[in-house]
Amino acid sequence: MSAMMLSEQPDILKAAALLPPRLSLGSTMVVHGLAKLRKEGTETHVGFFEQLGIRPARPFVLATGVTELLAGVSAILGFATRPAALAVLVTQAVAIAKVHGSKGFDVTKGGYEFNLALSAIALGLLVRGPGRLSVSEALGEWARRRERRRLRWLPRQRRASRTLDLLG
C-alpha cells in the first residue's frame, strides 16, 4: 500500500487506527494487574519479587498491580493515555532488567520478546496519544464547545458589567 493511499483513507479509519494498539495493550495490562491483585496472585508474586531481590515485596507487588490495572483501563478508554503508556514503559523496563533480559529475546525461553512488543505499543501511544476515538478527545470536544458558548455570550456580559459599573 503506498503512502498516497494511506493519506487518502477516510477520517474514521484514521481515527480508528489507534484503537487496536490501545485495546490490546490495555487488556493485557488489566489482566496482568488483576493477576497481581488477587489474593493467590499477590502471594505468588510476593515470593517471586523476593527471589528477584525486590524488597519489601508486598508493597511493590501491589503498586505494580494497581499501576498495571490503571494503565490498562486508561489505555482502553483513551484517557490519560500518555501517563499510562509511560507507566507501562517503566514496568516493562523493570521486567526486562530483572527477569527477562538475561534469558535472551525468545519468549519461549522466558526472553523479553513480549515485553519489547508491549513497550513498542506503549511508546507509540506515548508519542501519538489516544487518537480521536477516545474519552480524552470527547472531553476535549465538550470543553471546546462549552468555551465557544461562553465566548459567544462574552460581549453581552461585558455590556451588562459596564452598565452595572455605571449604576454604581
Positions of PLM-derived features:
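Extended, low-polarity transmembrane helix blocks
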Residues: M1-A35, R58-V66, L77-G168
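Conserved short histidine dyad/triad with adjacent acidic residue
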Residues: L69
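Conformational-control "hinges and anchors"
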Residues: G72
